[in-house]
């Protein structure tokens, strides 16, 4: 079959959420469970027991489709033009990020999501500002991604310096 499009990943995430009953513990650290993995895709069920910011990251060439089962998440792409685009998603919503995309997600406490990656996730690139430059660090796909506090502060400072720019509404 081959790699799926980002839109196909989002559709698979929605179908997986609606057709599979997976139960994770109601307390403790956030957790993830692999729902399936084949040569074309891998699906993860994620539960955020506490609010969690993924920091800016990429999926090392894998497209992702996300379906929100419960709670809410915020997704923000890394802006190239200086205009921040933050979107909020609630239970029943789905969205996708292309394989070349850089984004961050903020999971509210209790958020439950299904993520489908194609091709299967091999690594995650984490982004942060170091000595004034944007740097990417490659990490394993099965560990929580670190926040990007300096990069986020740089974007917020740019918003403050240009008051005519505003966050996009959800």
Q: Each predicted region: which residue ranges?
A:
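Short acidic-glycine-tyrosine-enriched beta hairpin
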Residues: 65, 79-107
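Histidine-centered metal-chelating micro-motifs
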Residues: 53-55, 74, 94-104, 122-123
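Feature captures hydrophobic
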Residues: 40, 46-47, 57, 78, ...
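N-terminal leader/capping segments at the start of a protein or of a new domain
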Residues: 1-22
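Double-stranded beta-helix
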Residues: 108-157
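Short, conserved beta-strand element in jelly-roll/cupin
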Residues: 47-50, 60-75, 116-119
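A short glycine-rich, His/Asp/Glu-containing loop-to-beta-strand
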Residues: 24-55
């Amino acid at each position: 079959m081959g790699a799926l499009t980002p839109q196909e990943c989002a559709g698979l995430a929605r179908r997986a959420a609606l057709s599979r009953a997976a139960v994770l513990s109601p307390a403790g650290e956030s957790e993830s469970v692999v729902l399936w993995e084949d040569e074309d895709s891998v699906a993860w069920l994620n539960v955020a027991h506490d609010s969690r910011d993924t920091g800016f990251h990429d999926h090392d060439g894998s497209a992702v489709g996300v379906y929100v089962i419960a709670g809410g998440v915020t997704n923000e792409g890394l802006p190239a033009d200086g205009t921040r685009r933050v979107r909020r998603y609630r239970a029943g919503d789905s969205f996708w990020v292309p394989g070349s995309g850089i984004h961050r997600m903020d999971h509210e406490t209790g958020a439950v999501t299904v993520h489908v990656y194609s091709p299967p996730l091999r690594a995650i690139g984490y982004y942060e500002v170091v000595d004034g430059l944007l740097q990417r660090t490659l990490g394993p796909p099965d560990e929580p991604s670190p926040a990007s506090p300096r990069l986020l502060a740089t974007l917020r400072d740019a918003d403050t310096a240009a008051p005519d720019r505003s966050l996009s509404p959800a």
